[in-house]
Amino acid sequence: MSCLNLHVPKNPVGKYIPLVVLLQMYIIYVEPYYGLHYFESVRQFLGPKILYGTVYFLVICHSIESAIAFLLCLKKGLPFCSSMKWIVSTFIFGGPTLAMLNKQKKHIA
C-alpha cells in the first residue's frame, strides 16, 4: 500500500491548490454544460479565452515539471513505484514537490 501514497508538499497552502484548480475546471467545463449560472459573472468578467488559456498553460507547465521529475528520479536511481509517486505528485502540486525531490539524497524513496 505504500506505493499509493503521494509525496505532498509541507506547505499547507499547497495542499489546497488542486481544489482551486478543480473549482476553475468546474466553472469552465461543468457549469455551462448543465446550464447552471452560479459563476456566470466570473465567466463574463474573465472571458473564455483567459479561462481556457490558464488551464492549458498550467497543464503544459505541470507536464514539463513532471518530465523534470522523471529525469531526476532516473538520475537518483529510484525504484519504479517511488518514481511514479514523485512524478504524479509533481504533476498535481508542481514546483514544491519538485523542490522536495531535488533535496532528496540518492536512493532515498
UniProtKB/Swiss-Prot annotation:
Membrane-topology descriptor: Multi-pass membrane protein
Key words, A-Z: Membrane, Transmembrane, Transmembrane helix
Record has Membrane as a keyword: yes
Entry's transmembrane regions: 16-36, 54-74, 80-100
Any one annotated GO CC term: membrane
Organism: Schizosaccharomyces pombe (strain 972 / ATCC 24843)
Localization of this protein: Membrane
Protein name according to UniProt: Uncharacterized membrane protein C688.16
InterPro entries in the record: TMEM254
